[in-house]
Amino acid sequence: MAAPRPSPAISVSVSAPAFYAPQKKFGPVVAPKPKVNPFRPGDSEPPPAPGAQRAQMGRVGEIPPPPPEDFPLPPPPLAGDGDDAEGALGGAFPPPPPPIEESFPPAPLEEEIFPSPPPPPEEEGGPEAPIPPPPQPREKVSSIDLEIDSLSSLLDDMTKNDPFKARVSSGYVPPPVATPFSSKSSTKPAAGGTAPLPPWKSPSSSQPLPQVPAPAQSQTQFHVQPQPQPKPQVQLHVQSQTQPVSLANTQPRGPPASSPAPAPKFSPVTPKFTPVASKFSPGAPGGSGSQPNQKLGHPEALSAGTGSPQPPSFTYAQQREKPRVQEKQHPVPPPAQNQNQVRSPGAPGPLTLKEVEELEQLTQQLMQDMEHPQRQNVAVNELCGRCHQPLARAQPAVRALGQLFHIACFTCHQCAQQLQGQQFYSLEGAPYCEGCYTDTLEKCNTCGEPITDRMLRATGKAYHPHCFTCVVCARPLEGTSFIVDQANRPHCVPDYHKQYAPRCSVCSEPIMPEPGRDETVRVVALDKNFHMKCYKCEDCGKPLSIEADDNGCFPLDGHVLCRKCHTARAQT
């Protein structure tokens, strides 16, 4: 690796809200665009520029590889030569973030510029002492837009992530420090050509940040101190073939300077709600600049590769500081009862005058109601159905037969038994118990049991439907014709005729109605009963007519004869 050329004289200025101090104008130089996006996987790594340094990205707790030994360590650049100085920052940059929209305060005047910081002390002694790296030359004019955009995006994100809308006070000026940038995973050659210590041999990261006063030296030294827990850094290439330029955070695009001016210096933006040092504050010699990053403990450092180039340290730190903004503890709101002064009813505490008056009125009203109870106005339908006395609302009552009764009044009409919760029968509008109601029922003439269901009444007597049958054949007579005998017993028609019908004097059979007819037709002659079919002449058997004509009956000596036979017998 070729030795870097001497960097131009740079002075550091400190301003309250600004990140960079204004410098004199220089001629504009077109910067080459980055060819590789270090954050995009798969892009090849650009070749390092002469005099460039490399920062390796690793994981927390991972031992970084030792620095390459195949290149000699160059001596530190000399001050005053700003024409051909090679920057230690790589030329590969990620796409710039969108420009910030909010305005920044004006840049400080040149009278407020502080003298440049002194160079870091060189390594003396054993390998345990920290080795200061060679100074990093300023970036050429082509990277000014990228740095301004990165700082603008950084400030915008910090403002949006602040829950309390923290702003840096305009009167606050942080003390100057020695190194605006700090590299963690790789080292730079020292002035004496001695390699720096590896990260595992670096001093403890818990040391405070030393503040070094700015001596009267015309160049800014960028120190690198390895830490036990390396943070991912970026490779930046800055070529000093052109004149150095300065950045002013008050404008999106800084004008080119015309003459060398003091180098810019970071102003740490410290939120008012956290005392932790900002990620973007410059570190001190000896690796103390990386301690704020270790305190923040960003988890994104674990996922970064160890060999891929990264964007500038301040941009990369902003991307990892977003999820870990330290928030201020929200004050606990006072309880609701403290905010509302109205006391809830029943809560302990002194009573107001209005509450005391209301309590006295309620007490007097209660005493009056107890001394003079009012009679309840009972409606007409709330009278007892038997005693016709009013029913109190709190008194239990029985609703039956469409009326209300006192429990003592709802009893059987015959035996005075209480009927509450029991089965009762209504007879002529009066309640009866089951026993008394059964006694009032008619009994069957056949079986002698009370008729509780259907009743059949015949010949002036009551019967169960299944008990009203023929006394001869026991066939039910419900719905059919029946005949009663002299003893008032029911008979079916066939059985009655068989038993009580007159018999024919010819065939000696009972004279019964013909099938399908209810009437019985018989012929009576000579005090004898005849069927219609049996009414004939005894001698010739000729059917006789019931009419008094020549075809009628001409009796003779007790015989039924026709006229011809009658004449014949009479002549003999």
UniProtKB/Swiss-Prot annotation:
Q: Where is the composition biased (Basic and acidic residues)?
A: 319-330
Q: Give me the ranges of the annotated region Disordered.
A: 23-351
Task: List the cysteine pairs that form cystine.
Answer: none
In which broad location class does this protein mainly occur, judging by the first location in its UniProt entry? cytoplasm
Question: Where's the LIM zinc-binding domain?
Answer: 384-443, 444-503, 504-570
Stated role: Adhesion plaque protein. Binds alpha-actinin and the CRP protein. Important for targeting TES and ENA/VASP family members to focal adhesions and for the formation of actin-rich structures. May be a component of a signal transduction pathway that mediates adhesion-stimulated changes in gene expression.
> What name has this protein been given in UniProt?
Zyxin
- Whichever gene encodes this chain, its name is ZYX
